[in-house]
Amino acid sequence: VQHQAMPGKPSRVYDRGAEWDGLTAFVSRPLPHAMLGIVSGRRRMGKTYLLRALVERCGGFYFSATAGTEAESLRQFSAALAEHVGSPVAFSFATWDDAVSYLFGLAAHGKRGASAGSTPDAPFLVVIDEFPYLVKVAPELPSLIQREIDRFQVEESRMRLLLCGSAMSVMGGLLASTAPLRGRAQLELVVRPFGYRAAADFWSVTDPALAARLHAVVGGTPAYRRQFLADDVPASLRDFDDWICRTVLSPFSPLFREARYLLAEEADIRDTALYHSVLAAVAQGNTTRGGIAGYIGRKSVDISHPLNVLEDSHLLMRELDVFRAGKSQYRITEPLINFYEAVMRPSWARLESGQAAEVWGQAAERFAAQVAGPHFEAMCREYVLGPGRSLLSTSLGEVGGGVVTDPKERRQIQIDVAVVEPGSGASRPSVALLGEVKWGTVMGVGHLERLGRARELLAGRGMDTTRCGLACFSAAGFTDALRAETARGDVLLVGLEELYGRAMPTGVLL
């Protein structure tokens, strides 16, 4: 296969530079054998948009499956393939076996006709979108593809096959331990939501206070701005309340039922009521397995399956406690689902009858405690993982959160943002940063003292804290007394302006 120049990303594709580079490197790699890539990501992330742009730039065959019977799906695939190769008559494959064999045959070395205008040595890009729909009606497909991939690891081939889908449990299962395609993929790409900074730019919001609230509700899902809301963007922080009522909380808006659809679309979710109860428990602040079980009135062992399914679907994430082995907390990954469970579901009947303004007026406390607050913590961890990393004494270490127990005071100190480097060999585990996050509280010296106490306790347990900085993250600001403490050389203050790159943090870590 001849080496292809890397095609540039179209200007209409916002952000996604790393994803584009990964895809084009996969397509243009000069390997004379078949290559397989798996592209997944929850719905509305722009996967199809990205892959269509790739096919436009690189040439190739794009097919998007739909929900249907096996016969109908095979007929649609056959017709699309016939059109692609310019056949005057439609193909009528009797089985998927025949269709897959023919498809790979098009990419055999020196074969012409795979792509209009392509040279015999050019890679043949094939994108099969919504692949889980096909697997549902033709479960033998992964095995058929495995057979052809294995064959064309020996024989020469120009095939660059990308299988794409949104049912995360199905897509994740394609490469699982005993799956036919295990070990066959040269690319495994998960298209994730935009980070909070990219999302603010995408929504054209320049006010950090508005951007943070907006991200706490709709997250970084690209489709929500244009496809769902037709560019209805809150004009200012003052407009945010009205915007919430006319969009997410309006029964006439597509976003109103979106959280329910996101759950219903996952292939492995049957009893949606149970899954909504699990998500509601987490949204209410019951983030441990025992807490979730207690909230919904089940035993811990009885909720293992729904927790696993929600994790496999990328709707729930288990975050390990960086200070206590074996301890973990669950977090809802999709902000809109968290907002639905915390604010909308408890008042669903009233919202359906058009009482958005009244419901939202009574939800301010819940929004701050259950939506904006926890989301702000995740944003602060994202900041430390990315743009804020240069402020630390080390570029290494795991970013997370955890609890430090203070036996003397009989209390637990919650650390919202921590950077911990595990020990290896002769080196002790070290802590580079301990941080506390507050959404609606002006932070003062007391918060800093609590972090300092946690640092002492960790040092007493044998962790290296000699270069451990203390950070206070607040969306509401800091007292003058706390600002004065930044002269010490081990304190950082990070507000919304700093989080969004509008200003540098106050203080320095020496």
Locate each region found by the language model:
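Conserved catalytic cores of phosphodiester-cleaving nucleases, focusing on short active-site segments
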Residues: 384, 413-423, 428-441, 451, ...
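Mid-core helix/loop region of P-loop NTP-binding domains shared across ATPases and GTPases
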Residues: 88-127, 133-137, 144, 148-158
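Accessory nucleic acid-recognition modules appended to NTPase machines
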Residues: 228-230, 237-415
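Conserved small helical "lid"/interfacial subdomain of P-loop NTPases
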Residues: 186-211
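N-terminal pre-P-loop "Q-motif" helix
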Residues: 12-24
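Domain-level recognition of nuclease-like catalytic cores that cleave nucleotide substrates
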Residues: 464-510
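Sensor-1/coupling segment of RecA-like P-loop NTPase cores
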Residues: 37-41, 133-137, 141-178
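Conserved NTP-binding/hydrolysis module of P-loop NTPases
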Residues: 57-61, 67, 71-90, 104, ...
